[in-house]
Amino acid sequence: MPGGRRGPSRQQLSRSALPSLQTLVGGTCGNGTGLRNRNGSAIGLSAPPITALITPEPVRHCRIPELPVDGGLLFEFLFFIYLLVALFIQYINIYKSVWWYPYNHPASCTSLNFHLIDYHLAAFITVMLARRLVWALISEASQVGTSSVVHYTTLIIGRLVLLTLCGWIFCWTLVNLFRNHSLLNLLFLGYPFGVYVPLCCFHQDNRSQPLPTDCGYLVPDSLVDEGANGAGSLVRPKDFLSLLRESLREQLNSAPSVPSHSCPLSPDLIRNEVECLKSDFNRRIKEVLFNSLFSAYYVAFLPLCFVKSTQYYDMRWSCEHLIMVWINAFVMLSTQLLPPKYCDLLHRSASHLGKWQKLEHGAYSNAPQHIWSENTVWPQGVLVRHSRSLYKAVGPYNVAVPSEVSHARFYFLFHRPLRLLNLLLVIEGSLVLYQLYSLLRAEKWNHTLSIALILFCNYYVLFKLLRDRIVLGRAYSYPFSSYGLKPH
């Protein structure tokens, strides 16, 4: 073979021409690894970066207008009126009479069989439905500043009178129900509380990770101290009374104020903010689900449990009314607890978080691959390896953990700002269309009356959703250059 000095091979030339990780992502990799070859072995690059070839695209946020939202007391009053209307409709469906017949029977003199209605049960249901309104009244009155001793004394007396009246009616109805009904029927009175305690009170989030101190607006200070002092250790299980007190405090407290978004630059701060918002969103969804099911249970299901065996009613129509009440209560509570400003906050946080797409083994074998680092902001299209898997950056700004399913779920739900609003609009619009169709085909007087009354309530909710969708759709479609915004 001819001698002489050999030149660099094609593989060596290709390796030396590739930029380092600092050049690609505009930062340093915490583990000191560089690119990978086809066999998957790491290649250390000692050459300094030439120029910044790929930089993360800056995150820009749209400015949305301030949309009117019902106050806490006004919403609770409207929600209580809606539940009373739905309860009245269910009693019509159960105890309707043939009032157009000749007056040969006392029951035919009126449109309802009033002698079959249990008024103690109706009073008990009304008290249970009014619990949120009563607490909203007390909370609003407590927030008003007391300028004099007389005003403060009047406030205390008014609260005591209101709570005493509700407690007396509640106990009076319970005593009469215990006298007139069997134990099996009485078990249905507290069934929602029996389900809520094991499902919600005993549910403990995984707090092995330290909670960030900059999210104090979302979690109590005690939990922040526990997360800061007990990093790496699990929280001790709490007793039943402590869990019950915390759960009741969450139910009785008014809805928390919408937190603010600070556009953090550190990947750790972004992930901590996402964890706080995720916990807050789960708590709000839990409150929406419980209160909507609670309302539908006491409005439409509990009256069916106390119907006498000799009483005939349309089971299919009553169950249909139950489903309609639950869906509309769910949408009403969602629009109040998940306002547009809060959804925009979740969208901004998801834009900073980003997402990773898992690739199959052997894909992109010729492309540069890096070891994922938690201190690096990854641009779109970069390939990283994490937990023996290959991932591709999807978002323009990526700090999420590739193997964390909750991060991918958070980005999927909130990276489009109108996704939740569109979902609620589709649900409410479908419900209204179905009710209009049922109204056209209704032949019985109680069906026509019940659908007409419910439609008046649903029109208000649908109007608010359509208004928010039109305004926010134009706001998010407006070009960024027109705002004069600076990228974060």
From Swiss-Prot:
Coiled coil: none annotated. Keywords: Glycoprotein, Membrane, Transmembrane, Transmembrane helix. InterPro entries: Uncharacterised_TMEM39 (IPR019397). One of its GO terms (biological process) is negative regulation of autophagosome assembly. The chain crosses the membrane at residues 72-92, 110-130, 155-175, 182-202, 287-307, 319-339, 420-440, 446-466. GO terms for cellular component: endoplasmic reticulum membrane. The keyword Transmembrane helix applies. It is found in: Membrane. The keyword ATP-binding does not apply. Glycans are attached at N31, N39, N180, N206. It is a multi-pass membrane protein. Belongs to the TMEM39 family. This is Transmembrane protein 39A-A.
